[in-house]
A protein has these predicted regions:
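C-terminal non-catalytic regions of proteins with extracellular/luminal or membrane-system context
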Residues: 1-122
Length: 122
């Protein structure tokens, strides 16, 4: 399928609508918005959950021409930097478990994540 200018315009409109439609249930300690560090460097974040890789935004009858998961969206940001080791563990889990399911958290080093990351996205 060729991507047209009109499709690109629609993608921008859809992105803006999705961003405006996100519901924040509780913003404890002003966690959001995630901002860069004081020196301007991206904020290191731990992103949890296998749905970070391919966020379901469509029903089974639709085939989107473009879909961006949570992890890829955050990685493209200049504001935050997802933890690469944690992302690799989730990608490996997804490849080894194509039937789905959530990765057990018992294999994660939460002490290292707490030390290396300033925020967590679940």
């Amino acid at each position: 399928m060729d991507i047209t200018l009109r499709m690109s315009d629609h993608a921008l409109t859809a992105r803006a609508a999705a961003a405006a439609g996100i519901v924040l249930l509780q913003n404890k300690n002003w966690t959001l918005p995630l901002l860069p560090q004081e020196d301007g460097a991206p904020l290191p974040v731990a992103v949890f959950g296998v749905k970070q890789l391919q966020t379901p935004a469509f029903d089974k009858t639709m085939t989107p021409w473009r879909s961006i998961g949570v992890l890829d969206g955050l990685a493209a940001s200049e504001t935050v930097r997802p933890d690469a080791l944690l992302a690799r563990k989730y990608r490996t889990w997804a490849v080894e478990h194509p039937e789905g399911g959530e990765m057990p958290l018992t294999n994660l080093d939460f002490g290292a994540l707490r030390h290396d990351c300033a925020a967590a996205v679940v």
